[in-house]
Amino acid sequence: MASQTGVLLLNLGGPDRPEDVRPFLYNLFSDPEIIRLPFRWLQKPLAWFISTSRARRSQANYAQIGGGSPLRRITEQQARALKDALEGIGIEANLYIGMRYWHPFTEEAIAQIKADQIRELVILPLYPQFSISTSGSSFRLLESLWNQDPELQKIRYTLIPSWYNHPGYVAAMADLIRQELDRCPNPDEAVIFFSAHGVPKSYVTEAGDPYQEEIEACVRLIMAALNRPNAHVLAYQSRVGPVEWLQPYTEDVILELAAQGVKTLVVVPISFVSEHIETLQEIDIEYREIAAEAGIEVFRRVPALNDHNGFISALAQLVKEALAAPPRTFAEVNQSRKRVKLYPQERWEWGMTSAAERWNGRLAMLGFLALMIELISGQGPLHMLGLL
């Protein structure tokens, strides 16, 4: 008899081929959790503009790592390894992969889950730390699918919002860092550089996103498990657009450390569990070049966990614990910890209020975007007036 238990692994997704880059970017920037705008109707046109203008540069970046993202292949390896690990602890389960912005899409995974008549489902994001722009975006999509489909509502599901503090995950990260440190000429002199994917600062300060808090706690846990004397720093990478993101920024800290005389860096991709463009290209190529030009002599990067045995065992334990615990629902997890209005704003607000200030910021962003479009296109009201 086929198993009626399923595990749905959630991830971002990535383009498999150069021709997939533009539609992937369009899907990414169409998500209001990625770029928040005051009016829904602006989302698709802006996504089209950004994906079209960025496609060529992004394709060049992907060309540096073979033309496409390895994320799907690695996630499939993780799913197979997790299925075997679950069988090893007596749990028969079907594994499904749901990517947010590229194939196999979350909707495709849900269709297969229904076809397989799954009755118990663990939803496990492959993001150790929760953010409204990663796990939160996928959870909101799933919640919408559940609300629209009576068949899905028959499934007993549970969410694992984050697992940055799971002992097995922490131990696996410490193990990989230890191995990389020991490859350095002078291991104790290396600075351990944790680089996390950034998010706009407003996600944390306005929307109550726990991401920064969980990242910082995760670093403390890993350093305690590592138990080495090395200095360490935390910075944030992959900033996009004109708004302020979490700081300090990775490239700035690299330059600061080099100016202080640091010669050896061991970079840890703290928010990534699989190799993809932000580890293979952004860290391994861009940041390595910045470090070398600044005088860093040894630049080593800790590999992503991928299908590391300890990591897969930790995922299996997470699933086991989730099946035994009371279920966690979308309504529970998607509720912001702060009482502020999340996207989309339902009405305009005037005055010196936090809501009015958010509108001011959004209008400023729209003005900036309009200026960028005019600068790129060479057409618009400022050109007509002779101001550009």
Swiss-Prot record:
Q: What class of enzyme is it?
A: lyase
The primary location reported for this protein is cytoplasm
Q: Which GO terms describe its biological process?
A: heme biosynthetic process
Binding positions for Fe cation per the UniProt entry = H197, E278
Q: Which Pfam families match?
A: Ferrochelatase
User: What exactly does this protein do?
Assistant: Catalyzes the ferrous insertion into protoporphyrin IX.
Name of the protein described by the UniProt record: Ferrochelatase
Organism the protein comes from: Thermosynechococcus vestitus (strain NIES-2133 / IAM M-273 / BP-1)
Source taxonomy lineage?
Bacteria, Bacillati, Cyanobacteriota, Cyanophyceae, Acaryochloridales
